[in-house]
Amino acid sequence: MSIERITYDNFQNDPFINELDINDETKGAYEILKWAYQTYENDIVYSCSFGAESMVLIDLISQIKPDAQIVFLDTDLHFQETYDLIDRVKDKYPQLRIKMKKPELTLEEQGEKYNPALWKNDPNQCCYIRKIKPLEDVLSGAVAWISGLRRAQSPTRAHTNFINKDERFKSIKVCPLIYWTEEEVWSYIRDKDLPYNELHDQNYPSIGCIPCTSPVFDSNDSRAGRWSNSSKTECGLHVTDKP
């Protein structure tokens, strides 16, 4: 693909949305990733949650740029199973450069400054401190970043394009998996025998921080179980409103 380098300042629309064959094996994901790494080279970062979609993207990225930079927002509140998965990914893809990005405040410092249970009393502020601000720091030196958003995940993600102007981070957000279904994600994982978070086998469709993630037994919503006792549906990385 010969599309020019798209930046936050020159973005007009997604040039790929009606151009790629979404009926191919990866529904356009491989082609988008190939273009992204050829275009942005080292100016693009994959912000990885190590969820199911992440396993698909990591495998595709490793075929295109084996030493790609991947950032995990380590809030210090993740499940041990998530950290175990990261170790397995490092073993399987040893060339990948996986960076564990921590917040400026430790949990103890956050508790002293705000509230010992900030994730419960003000989850938006907690997400800002432990996820959004760290990603702001990471993206300050990048032109674009990759995300595993899928349109079918939730109403707030239903209009996501391959290439998006990201107002939150003043960046370009590349979303290769927008047309994938949850079933296709898991078929890819199983067909390729990829590692994945063991909590998925324990009724956790979506996995984040321990205090804000619950198992789900009666919903087909892939985002169910996140902030289940509140109206909150996003950590804030993919919305423009600030706390």
UniProtKB/Swiss-Prot annotation:
Domain of life of the organism encoding this protein: Bacteria
Lineage: Bacteria, Bacillati, Bacillota, Bacilli, Bacillales
UniProt function note: Catalyzes the formation of sulfite from adenosine 5'-phosphosulfate (APS) using thioredoxin as an electron donor.
Residues holding [4Fe-4S] cluster: 126-127, 209, 212
Gene source species: Staphylococcus epidermidis (strain ATCC 35984 / DSM 28319 / BCRC 17069 / CCUG 31568 / BM 3577 / RP62A)
Entries under CDD domains matching the protein: PAPS_reductase (cd23945)
UniProt-listed Gene3D superfamilies: HUPs
Protein name per its UniProtKB record: Adenosine 5'-phosphosulfate reductase
Similarity annotation: Belongs to the PAPS reductase family. CysH subfamily.
GO biological process: cysteine biosynthetic process; hydrogen sulfide biosynthetic process; sulfate assimilation, phosphoadenylyl sulfate reduction by phosphoadenylyl-sulfate reductase (thioredoxin)
The UniProt record lists the keyword Heme: no
Pfam families: PAPS_reduct
Positions of the catalytic residues: 235
Catalytic activity: [thioredoxin]-disulfide + sulfite + AMP + 2 H(+) = adenosine 5'-phosphosulfate + [thioredoxin]-dithiol
Coiled-coil portions: none
Textual note on the cofactor: Binds 1 [4Fe-4S] cluster per subunit.
Subcellular location: Cytoplasm
EC number: 1.8.4.10
Cofactor(s) the protein requires to work: [4Fe-4S] cluster
Single GO MF annotation: adenylyl-sulfate reductase (thioredoxin) activity
Entry keywords, A to Z: Cytoplasm, Iron, Iron-sulfur, Metal-binding, Oxidoreductase
UniProt pathway annotation: Sulfur metabolism; hydrogen sulfide biosynthesis; sulfite from sulfate
